[in-house]
Structure formats: C-alpha cells, structure tokens
Amino acid sequence: MKKMILIAGPCVIESKDLIFKVAKQLKNFNENPNIEFYFKSSFDKANRTSINSFRGPGLEEGLKILQSVKDEFGMKILTDIHESNQANPVSEVADVLQIPAFLCRQTDLLVAAAKTKAKVNIKKGQFLNPSDIKYSVKKVLQTRGIEDEGYEAAQKNGVFVAERGASFGYGNLVVDMRSLVIMREFAPVIFDATHSVQMPGAAGGSSGGKSEFVEPLARAAAAVGIDGFFFETHINPCEALCDGPNMLDLTRLKNCVNTLLEIQNII
C-alpha cells in the first residue's frame, strides 16, 4: 500500500511544553510504516486578523523548539515561511517549507523555497482557480532546473500542493472536491481538513470554524483519492491561542487517521 502523507501538529508554537506534549502523542503516527509523517507547527503566524493576536515565539526560538522535536522524537518537520529571507535558515531545520495560501503566487517566496534542499508544500489560495496552482508548481520546478511538468515531476522533486477551501462569500469557505482531481494533474495533493472548515474573521477580530466537519470532509477527500492529509491538532482546542475553533481535538485524530487509511486501502 502506498504511504499516506500525514501532516499534523498545533497551529502555532505556543510553548515548548505544549509542543512536546503533542509530539509525544503523535509519535505513533511517525512509527507507522503506512504513514509518511511530518510534525507541523508555526514559529510565526504573520497573517493573523488582529495585531493583538498571538503570533508565536518568532524565528530563532521557534526553530530551536522544532529542532528539539526532531532530535527527541525523530520526526520530520514542516513549517511555513512568509518572507524570502526565511527560506535558508528554516530549511536548516524543516524538511518541508510551506507556502501560505495567501502567498501562493508570490514568486520571490516560491523561488527562495525552491533554492533550498527542502520539499515545498504550496497551499492553494482561497481565491485561486485550482487549475492555476500549476503556475506556482512550475515556479518551484523551473527554479530547480526541471522543465518537465505534471504529477510525477512534482513528486520526484519534492513539490506538493494543499487544498484548504475556497472563499464562499464573506467569512466562509467551502470545499470543491473537483479541485483535488484537478490539482493532482500537476502535483501530489494534500487535503488540509482543518483550515477547510475555518470561517475567516467570523469571530470578530479572529477566525471562527466548524470543527465538526473536519472528519466528514477528510473522509470525502480520501474517497476521491489523494496523497495525504493536514490536520492542525491540540490537546485542548478551546484554549488554543490560534485557530482553536477549526482544530481537531488530539483525542479524535487516531480514529480519524485509521479510517482514512482504510478508505485509501479500498480505493
């Protein structure tokens, strides 16, 4: 059976203690031979709705904490970058550089990520036609000297894309499952099940969300046939400092992932 990519962890690095508690509970996924696991957390949430919102510990301290997760648990790391000058230092720790959805067309950022040895996960913007993600993929591939296009070229050269919902009026997102099929023509596809149920800005200065839809949408995406899943998860989402309303409670993740593996095995 083909390995399923699983990206999971808290939205933002709230503290080293929390990160280690979550990583400890995720280590079974890292040891599962059917899963290609990446621990995810952000050192800086640079696009929070309000200037008063918690952003994280910053680059230097954040990378130290992520490196300690790597050392302690043997996990691969995924984290996002927001500026081109972050690509090189972050790639010294992270195995995957994530391009945020709002920045998925930023050429300088994509090129900077492509010039590192890290894999690159491009999150499709909420505003973007799914077929247009191919141009972002091509920016990475061509920077790496790859003229070939398509799924195999992207897979071979460490580029994948993530679906995280499309804007549906103000303060709401919907998932068009057709986008998973369309984007998979250009690169391996990850379904970001937690951000797909986000309600941007709906909580008055912060984003809301409908976490009860995380698992049903993930199952639907698995049935379409994709390469992996992205879950932001927390010990207590109600107390999370970022994206709590759309995060999956850590106690629900194991059963959810097992179900996705079963669906993947069937199709």
Swiss-Prot record:
Question: A GO molecular function for this record?
Answer: 3-deoxy-8-phosphooctulonate synthase activity
Q: Which PANTHER family does the record match to this protein?
A: PHOSPHO-2-DEHYDRO-3-DEOXYHEPTONATE ALDOLASE
Keyword Transferase assigned to the entry: answer is yes
> GO CC terms on record?
cytoplasm
Enumerate the InterPro entries for this protein.
Aldolase_TIM, DAHP1/KDSA, KDO8P_synthase
Report the source organism: Campylobacter jejuni subsp. doylei (strain ATCC BAA-1458 / RM4099 / 269.97)
Root EC class: transferase
- What is this protein's gene name? kdsA
Question: Which pathway does it take part in?
Answer: Carbohydrate biosynthesis; 3-deoxy-D-manno-octulosonate biosynthesis; 3-deoxy-D-manno-octulosonate from D-ribulose 5-phosphate: step 2/3; Bacterial outer membrane biogenesis; lipopolysaccharide biosynthesis
Q: What is the lineage of its organism?
A: Bacteria, Pseudomonadati, Campylobacterota, Epsilonproteobacteria, Campylobacterales
Q: What is this protein called?
A: 2-dehydro-3-deoxyphosphooctonate aldolase
Q: Which Pfam families match?
A: DAHP_synth_1
